[in-house]
Amino acid sequence: FPSVQSNAAAYLQHLCFGDNKIKAEIRRQGGIQLLVDLLDHRMTEVHRSACGALRNLVYGKANDDNKIALKNCGGIPALVRLLRKTTDLEIRELVTGVLWNLSSCDALKMPIIQDALAVLTNAVIIPHSGWENSPLQDDRKIQLHSSQVLRNATGCLRNVSSAGEEARRRMRECDGLTDALLYVIQSALGSSEIDSKTVENCVCILRNLSYRLAAETSQGQHMGTDELDGLLCGEANGKDAESSGCWGKKKKKKKSQDQWDGVG
């Protein structure tokens, strides 16, 4: 009975909103596994309710146990499968919202990169950025900054981009990702959208991917660290890299601000 399953999942979503004790109890009763199983259901309404419940269950740093439980249930691949196949905008917003919430848990950053990076890039970030459709630039500007899906996806990648050298390598090598992120920023220049959360996410992803770029890329190893660093920082007007706010001590201070749980 799909309607019963949908209503039950929707009730769990309502029940656990803002209540960490109930969230933990749902996990102990096996509810996360049951909700993950519903992501492969044939009915769109069931997908919508299951995603809404999962989004609430994994919201907040206090619920990292729920995030890990979702991962252990095969939840990340299930979310990716649903994102790949659904055309329902609300479900796409919910799926990317769940992934953004999951991405604040350090233990899940690499699993998200392994299972979700390619689909987030190819199914969300590139098409929503407008990078491949530059002749429609004005229309795309309106769409990309009002896109909750793009905001969620860039928020997720912003968090996982801080997961270390292997994470940075995979993201740098993800075809089209950096181009699309740069296009989002470029399209916002000179408009009020320059202060949007989506643009902020894109800037922070690129900042993290530029960290130790010379030392970690074959081009940098070939040219020598000092030479490539000079090229990268040529517009810094002689300022120390730390004082530029891209890495070093300032990055450590801002780490907690760069990791949040998305849309709730």
Curated annotation (Swiss-Prot):
<dbReference type="GO" id="GO:0001763">
    <property type="term" value="P:morphogenesis of a branching structure"/>
</dbReference>
<keyword id="KW-0325">Glycoprotein</keyword>
<dbReference type="InterPro" id="IPR011989">
    <property type="entry name" value="ARM-like"/>
</dbReference>
<dbReference type="GO" id="GO:0005912">
    <property type="term" value="C:adherens junction"/>
</dbReference>
<protein>
    <recommendedName>
        <fullName>Catenin delta-2</fullName>
    </recommendedName>
</protein>
<comment type="similarity">
    <text>Belongs to the beta-catenin family.</text>
</comment>
<dbReference type="InterPro" id="IPR028435">
    <property type="entry name" value="Plakophilin/d_Catenin"/>
</dbReference>
<dbReference type="GO" id="GO:0050808">
    <property type="term" value="P:synapse organization"/>
</dbReference>
<comment type="subunit">
    <text>Binds to E-cadherin at a juxtamembrane site within the cytoplasmic domain. Binds to PSEN1. Interacts with ZBTB33. Interacts with ARHGEF28. Interacts (via the extreme C-terminus) with FRMPD2 (via the PDZ 2 domain). Interacts with PDZD2. Interacts with CDK5. Interacts with CTNBB1. Interacts with GSK3A and GSK3B. Interacts with DNM2. Interacts with CCDC85B.</text>
</comment>
<feature type="repeat" description="ARM 2">
    <location>
        <begin position="64"/>
        <end position="104"/>
    </location>
</feature>
<dbReference type="GO" id="GO:0008013">
    <property type="term" value="F:beta-catenin binding"/>
</dbReference>
<dbReference type="GO" id="GO:0043204">
    <property type="term" value="C:perikaryon"/>
</dbReference>
<keyword id="KW-0539">Nucleus</keyword>
<dbReference type="GO" id="GO:0060828">
    <property type="term" value="P:regulation of canonical Wnt signaling pathway"/>
</dbReference>
<feature type="repeat" description="ARM 4">
    <location>
        <begin position="166"/>
        <end position="211"/>
    </location>
</feature>
<dbReference type="GO" id="GO:0007612">
    <property type="term" value="P:learning"/>
</dbReference>
<dbReference type="GO" id="GO:0014069">
    <property type="term" value="C:postsynaptic density"/>
</dbReference>
<keyword id="KW-0804">Transcription</keyword>
<dbReference type="InterPro" id="IPR016024">
    <property type="entry name" value="ARM-type_fold"/>
</dbReference>
<feature type="repeat" description="ARM 3">
    <location>
        <begin position="120"/>
        <end position="162"/>
    </location>
</feature>
<keyword id="KW-0130">Cell adhesion</keyword>
<comment type="function">
    <text>Has a critical role in neuronal development, particularly in the formation and/or maintenance of dendritic spines and synapses. Involved in the regulation of canonical Wnt signaling. It probably acts on beta-catenin turnover, facilitating beta-catenin interaction with GSK3B, phosphorylation, ubiquitination and degradation. May be involved in neuronal cell adhesion and tissue morphogenesis and integrity by regulating adhesion molecules. Functions as a transcriptional activator when bound to ZBTB33.</text>
</comment>
<dbReference type="GO" id="GO:0060997">
    <property type="term" value="P:dendritic spine morphogenesis"/>
</dbReference>
<dbReference type="GO" id="GO:0106028">
    <property type="term" value="P:neuron projection retraction"/>
</dbReference>
<dbReference type="GO" id="GO:0045773">
    <property type="term" value="P:positive regulation of axon extension"/>
</dbReference>
<dbReference type="GO" id="GO:0098919">
    <property type="term" value="F:structural constituent of postsynaptic density"/>
</dbReference>
<dbReference type="GO" id="GO:0098978">
    <property type="term" value="C:glutamatergic synapse"/>
</dbReference>
<dbReference type="GO" id="GO:0098609">
    <property type="term" value="P:cell-cell adhesion"/>
</dbReference>
<dbReference type="InterPro" id="IPR000225">
    <property type="entry name" value="Armadillo"/>
</dbReference>
<keyword id="KW-0966">Cell projection</keyword>
<keyword id="KW-0965">Cell junction</keyword>
<dbReference type="GO" id="GO:0005634">
    <property type="term" value="C:nucleus"/>
</dbReference>
<feature type="region of interest" description="Disordered">
    <location>
        <begin position="238"/>
        <end position="264"/>
    </location>
</feature>
<keyword id="KW-0217">Developmental protein</keyword>
<dbReference type="GO" id="GO:0030425">
    <property type="term" value="C:dendrite"/>
</dbReference>
<dbReference type="GO" id="GO:0099072">
    <property type="term" value="P:regulation of postsynaptic membrane neurotransmitter receptor levels"/>
</dbReference>
<feature type="repeat" description="ARM 1">
    <location>
        <begin position="20"/>
        <end position="59"/>
    </location>
</feature>
<dbReference type="Pfam" id="PF00514">
    <property type="entry name" value="Arm"/>
</dbReference>
<keyword id="KW-0805">Transcription regulation</keyword>
<keyword id="KW-0677">Repeat</keyword>
<dbReference type="GO" id="GO:0048167">
    <property type="term" value="P:regulation of synaptic plasticity"/>
</dbReference>
